[in-house]
C-alpha cells in the first residue's frame, strides 16, 4: 500500500524548469554615468591647468587736450613776462639784467664744475683744498673761469699782469722759465691770429681765425687748465 502511495506521489510530481534569472535592462547605466562623469572631471581639470594668457596693458593715449592747455599756459606766461619787462623803468631793467646775468653765471659755473668732476660746490673757491695733480687742475679750471668773467673790463690786462707776477714770486727760476716760454708761445700765436684777421677783406662771410688747440706748441700751457673755454685766449 505504501508503495502505491509513493508511486502515485512520484507520478504527480512535476519538475518545473528553473526560471532564468531576470535581466535588468537598466543594469550598468549607473556605471556608464560614473565613467562619463570622471571623464568630464578630467577635462575640467585640464582646462583649469592651462595657463591663462595675460593681456598686455594698453598704452596710455597722449592727452592732446592737456598738452594744448600746457602750451597755452606757457604762452600766456611769456606774454605776461614781456609786458612786465616793458613796464620796467631803466633802473629796474638794469637790475633785472644783472639778476639774469647772475643766474646765468651760476649755471655756467655749475656746468663747469660738473665737466671737470668737481663735486664740492659749497663755499665756492674756498671749498677747494687741492693736493693731487687732478685736484689742482679742477681748482685751476674753476679759478680761470671765475677770473675770465671780468675780461671785458679795461682793468683786466693790468690785473692779469699783476696776478701772474704775484703767482710767480713763489716759483723757482726753472719754473718761471717754463711759464715764460708758454706765455711767449701764446704771444706768438696771438700775433699770427691778429695778422691773419687783419688781412681778411670784410664782407666775405668767413669766420674769424681762432687759436688752434690741438697738436700745437701750446699744449703745455693748456695743461694748467687754461683751455677751459674756447674764448679764453683773451685771458693773457
Curated annotation (Swiss-Prot):
Major site of localization recorded for this protein: cytoplasm
Pfam families, per the entry: eIF3_subunit
Cellular component aspect of the GO annotation: eukaryotic 43S preinitiation complex; eukaryotic 48S preinitiation complex; eukaryotic translation initiation factor 3 complex
Any GO molecular function: translation initiation factor activity
Family annotation (InterPro entries): eIF3-like_dom_sf, eIF3j
This protein's UniProt keywords: Cytoplasm, Initiation factor, Protein biosynthesis
Skewed-composition ranges (Basic and acidic residues): 47-58
Comp. bias intervals (Acidic residues): 28-46
Keyword Nucleotide-binding in record: no
GO biological process, one term: formation of cytoplasmic translation initiation complex
Keyword Cytoplasm: yes
Domain of life: Eukaryota
Compartment(s) of residence: Cytoplasm
Region annotation (Disordered) ranges: 1-65
Subunit note: Component of the eukaryotic translation initiation factor 3 (eIF-3) complex. The eIF-3 complex interacts with pix.
Function (record text): Component of the eukaryotic translation initiation factor 3 (eIF-3) complex, which is involved in protein synthesis of a specialized repertoire of mRNAs and, together with other initiation factors, stimulates binding of mRNA and methionyl-tRNAi to the 40S ribosome. The eIF-3 complex specifically targets and initiates translation of a subset of mRNAs involved in cell proliferation.
Homology family: Belongs to the eIF-3 subunit J family.
Full protein name: Eukaryotic translation initiation factor 3 subunit J
Species assigned in the record: Drosophila melanogaster (Fruit fly)
